[in-house]
From Swiss-Prot:
EC number of this enzyme: 3.5.4.16
Catalytic activity: GTP + H2O = 7,8-dihydroneopterin 3'-triphosphate + formate + H(+)
GO biological process terms on file: one-carbon metabolic process; tetrahydrobiopterin biosynthetic process; tetrahydrofolate biosynthetic process
Subunit structure: Homomer.
Gene3D superfamilies linked to this entry: 1.10.286.10, 3.30.1130.10
GO molecular function, one term: GTP binding
GO cellular component terms given for this protein: cytoplasm
Pfam families per record: GTP_cyclohydroI
Family listed: Belongs to the GTP cyclohydrolase I family.
UniProt superkingdom: Bacteria
Transmembrane segments: none
Protein's name in the database: GTP cyclohydrolase 1
Keywords of this entry: GTP-binding, Hydrolase, Metal-binding, Nucleotide-binding, One-carbon metabolism, Zinc
Length: 199
C-alpha cells in the first residue's frame, strides 16, 4: 500500500476552524496589516470556511469513494478525460489548477461509476499537494481500492506559484503521468495516450 495513503487512513484528521482563524489574524498582523480594519475584519472567518472546503480531502477516504462497482465484465480501457482539478501547492500555499485524465482496466468483479473517478481526483486534490504526488496517489488508489488491472493518470496544470511570483511564467503548464499494471505494456499505453491526446 502507498505509504502516504496508509498514513491518511490511520490518522484521524480533524479540522480546527478556530485555529485557522487565529492563524489568519496573526498572518495579517505579520505582513503589516490591521486585521481589525474594514475589509479584513471578516477575512479570518472567510478563509476558515474556504479552507474547510479547499482541504476537505484530508478528511476523505479513497476507499469509501471506490467501494461500489457495477457488475460489468470487461477487460477494455475505461477513460475519463478533462476532469477539472483545483489544488493548493504545499510549498507556497498557492493554487494550481488544470485537468486530470484517468483511465483504467477494470477488475474482474466490475466497473466503477464514472463519477467515482472525478470524486477520487477531488479526494487527493483537496489537500496541500504537489502535482507529482497527486498523480501517483490517484493511480495507486485505483489499484489498491478498486483492484484495477491497469491504470494511467495524466495531469496537466498551471501553478500560480510559478505564474504570479518567482519566474512569473503564466503560460507554462506542468504535465505528470503515472502508469500501473497492464497499461505499462507499450502498445496499451500508446493506445491510452492517443485517446488522451485526441482533442
Amino acid at each position: 500500500m502507498n505509504e502516504y495513503i496508509e498514513s491518511c487512513q490511520q490518522e484521524k484528521r480533524t479540522y480546527d476552524e478556530e485555529g485557522v482563524r487565529e492563524a489568519v489574524r496573526l498572518f495579517l498582523k505579520s505582513i503589516g496589516e490591521d486585521p481589525g480594519r474594514e475589509g479584513l475584519v471578516e477575512t479570518p472567518d472567510r478563509i476558515a470556511r474556504a479552507c474547510r472546503e479547499l482541504f476537505a480531502g484530508l478528511q476523505a477516504s479513497p476507499a469509501d469513494v471506490l467501494e461500489k462497482h457495477f457488475d460489468v465484465d470487461t477487460d477494455e480501457l475505461v477513460l475519463v478525460k478533462d476532469i477539472e482539478l483545483y489544488s493548493v501547492c504545499e510549498h507556497h500555499l498557492l493554487p494550481f489548477h488544470g485537468v486530470a485524465h484517468v483511465g483504467y482496466i477494470p477488475a474482474k468483479d466490475g466497473v466503477m461509476g464514472l463519477s467515482k473517478l472525478a470524486r477520487l481526483v477531488e479526494v487527493y486534490a483537496r489537500r496541500p499537494q504537489v502535482q507529482e504526488r497527486l498523480t501517483q496517489q490517484i493511480a495507486d488508489a485505483l489499484v489498491e481500492y478498486a483492484g484495477a488491472r491497469g491504470v494511467i493518470v495524466v495531469t496537466e496544470c498551471e501553478h500560480l506559484c510559478m505564474s504570479m511570483r518567482g519566474i512569473k511564467k503564466s503560460s507554462a503548464r506542468t504535465v505528470t503521468s503515472a502508469v500501473r499494471g497492464l497499461l505499462r505494456n507499450p502498445a496499451t499505453r500508446a493506445e491510452a495516450m492517443s485517446l488522451i491526446l485526441d482533442k
